Amino acid sequence: MELLKLNRSAQGSGAGPGASLCRAGGALLNSSGAGNLSCEPPRLRGAGTRELELAIRVTLYAVIFLMSVGGNVLIIVVLGLSRRLRTVTNAFLLSLAVSDLLLAVACMPFTLLPNLMGTFIFGTVVCKAVSYLMGVSVSVSTLSLVAIALERYSAICRPLQARVWQTRSHAARVIIATWMLSGLLMVPYPVYTAVQPAGGARALQCVHRWPSARVRQTWSVLLLLLLFFVPGVVMAVAYGLISRELYLGLRFDEDSDSESRVRSQGGLRGGAGPGPAPPNGSCRPEGGLAGEDGDGCYVQLPRSRQTLELSALTAPTPGPGGGPRPYQAKLLAKKRVVRMLLVIVVLFFLCWLPLYSANTWRAFDSSGAHRALSGAPISFIHLLSYASACVNPLVYCFMHRRFRQACLETCARCCPRPPRARPRPLPDEDPPTPSIASLSRLSYTTISTLGPG
């Protein structure tokens, strides 16, 4: 990802890739590991302002870095150890966590340290690697969100067709394809990335040196289309159809409940006719309350009489408050999952929209972008793009009940409590007498064994 190439100070003049964007008398304030230098006239900024801005920037970087690394490592561990969370959707969320962790570990330190030191000291290899890994991470995150949206659409709106290919092995193949496609798409970054001298005598910067301004513009527009607009349209359409299907499913269940109540009260005469047809692409669950991560509905196969009798005996009865039926509970669970995924998508695009816009603006009007975005705006855009790596763990913790439970179970497994030692009876104490419940259980067992007299 071409991160913050807006305020670059390079030797040379003109409108080419090496053109200087700093005015005469400008002072070098910071340099980014991605090759960005911010230059502003010293008369506009005092030493106290620069120190305060630097302290705020370092603090925010540290907080975002720790939250990104800790949160995504926790996601990877929990999804890897919990068998209940090994679903198709969570497989894509696991890939998303890996890409976010890659963005935090491989890019953030090499962006902050050059800002503090005023030069890029890591060499050409690290410069090319950081630029490449940053682009791969953003591309994988975008494609993973698209894959999740399409998978949810197939599971909820086309459940019969989705059951043929909706498996973890198919999800693994899709994940591998997203990483390979992202790796091929970002090949131009290491090819056209280099370390070159900056404004100072010994200052270096990691920059993209495109062959021409037209190539840079074409590349910016291509990334804007492939990684922002097209995925955004696909996800908007998919989640719109999903919301419509869930709404129709809830309406269908409400109509079924009202018709059942009317029949039980004798409102309908002449026998029980066929109920309302389910919405298009929907089906009834096979039974049981749905989990929070249901992957769709299953086809209800015909059962034998013994199975039906056993189901009638063991079926859960609604509570006194009139709890939701299994089908309604499954739809509500799907609604919660879709709501969580929508929050993830919205936050991702909110974090990256300013950067895509800034890069496209710079590709067509570098001097205007520099004048408008120098200083605090570009720092905010920078931090906002990196904040996308730490928002997903927060969303999971606040909106995913099973993930919270799995986190607690994982922590309990890693830090088990020592078992409490039972007090030993003293030698002069009598042995414990059986309780009333034990006697009742013993009497019931004896009577059941002997049978009727």
Swiss-Prot record:
A Pfam family in this protein? 7tm_1
Biased composition annotated in UniProt, kind: Polar residues: 435-453
Q: Where is this region: Disordered?
A: 258-286, 422-453
Statement: the UniProt record of this protein carries the keyword Translocase: no
Topological domain ranges for the Extracellular compartment:
1-57, 110-131, 190-220, 362-379
Give glycosylation sites per the record.
7, 30, 36
Q: Record's superkingdom?
A: Eukaryota
Q: Which organism is it from?
A: Canis lupus familiaris (Dog)
Q: Where is the lipid attached (S-palmitoyl cysteine)?
A: 414
Signal sequence residues:
none
Residue stretches spanning the membrane: 58-79, 88-109, 132-150, 171-189, 221-243, 340-361, 380-400
What protein does this entry describe? Answer: Gastrin/cholecystokinin type B receptor
Write out the GO cellular component annotations: intracellular membrane-bounded organelle; plasma membrane
Which pairs are disulfide-linked? 127-206
